[in-house]
Design a protein with these regions (language model features):
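Gly/Ala-rich beta-loop-alpha elbow adjacent to hydrolase catalytic centers
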Residues: 68-77
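Catalytic histidine neighborhood in serine/cysteine hydrolases
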Residues: 134-150
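A conserved short beta-strand
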Residues: 85-97
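Post-His helix in hydrolase/transferase enzymes
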Residues: 150-166
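Short beta-strand/loop motif that positions the catalytic acidic residue
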Residues: 109, 114-117, 121
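Acidic beta-to-alpha connecting loop that harbors the catalytic carboxylate
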Residues: 13, 119-121, 145-146
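Conserved alpha/beta-hydrolase "acid-adjacent" motif
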Residues: 18, 122-128
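Short, surface-exposed "cap/lid" segments of acyl-processing enzymes
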Residues: 2-44, 196
Length: 202
């Protein structure tokens, strides 16, 4: 439905669609009246297969899309963002800067992007997240946790809630008019100014 707000979760390579983090963050999203979709990507060995599955769900039909990814799921969300142009990208323990993924640091295509990473991540070095955040000028939250971030789940949930609220405020403040309407108003204002502008005698 065109008026829906939907959060799409993408789980990690070794986890499932309703792991501990996703369950907790899904509650946060539902409390803010987002519908939650968490596909099962466990049958896909290829990251590209996961991206294609996400795109096949036609998320662009929703009014407001937030993509949330964990580990490999962050890479999937980043790759899908180029076509979907979501309002938000919320990336946990992102699989970026890894040699076995191509592209290894996909560009984020979203109005708002935020990374959360553990200082003690044993799978994706924290330097990878820092470099990604620096290269694409996106905010990064570093927490005292490992790759799973479970020990900091309360903090992750609070960060996610603030992120969704910012996305909602951004949507509320957006100008709902079409480009044609904006151009017509600008044209009208220009003509009005020209009409009331006093003529300078020669």
């Amino acid at each position: 439905m065109a008026n829906e707000r939907i959060v799409y979760f993408a789980h990690g390579q070794e986890s499932g669609p309703w792991g501990t983090k996703i369950k907790r963050l899904a509650q946060v999203a539902e409390n803010l009246n987002f519908r939650v979709v968490s596909p099962d990507y466990s049958g896909f060995k290829s990251g590209y297969g996961r991206v294609e599955k996400l795109l096949s769900l036609q998320p662009s039909a929703a009014e407001q899309i937030i993509l949330v990814g964990s580990s490999m799921g962050s890479w999937v969300s980043l790759c899908a963002s180029e076509k979907l142009k979501p309002q938000g990208l919320f990336l946990l323990a992102s699989a970026v800067g890894l040699e076995n993924l191509e592209p290894n640091s996909p560009r984020p295509f979203a109005e708002k992007t935020l990374l959360v990473h553990g200082w003690d991540d044993e799978v994706v070095p924290v330097e990878n997240a820092i470099n990604f955040a620096r290269n694409y000028q996106v905010p990064l939250h570093l927490l005292p946790a490992d790759h799973r971030l479970i020990t900091q789940l309360d903090s992750v949930a609070n960060i996610f809630q603030n992120f969704l609220q910012q996305c909602l405020e951004s949507k509320k403040d957006a100008d709902p008019r079409s480009q044609w309407e904006k151009e017509q108003e600008a044209k009208f204002q220009k003509e009005t100014i020209n009409q009331i502008q006093p003529r300078i005698p020669r």
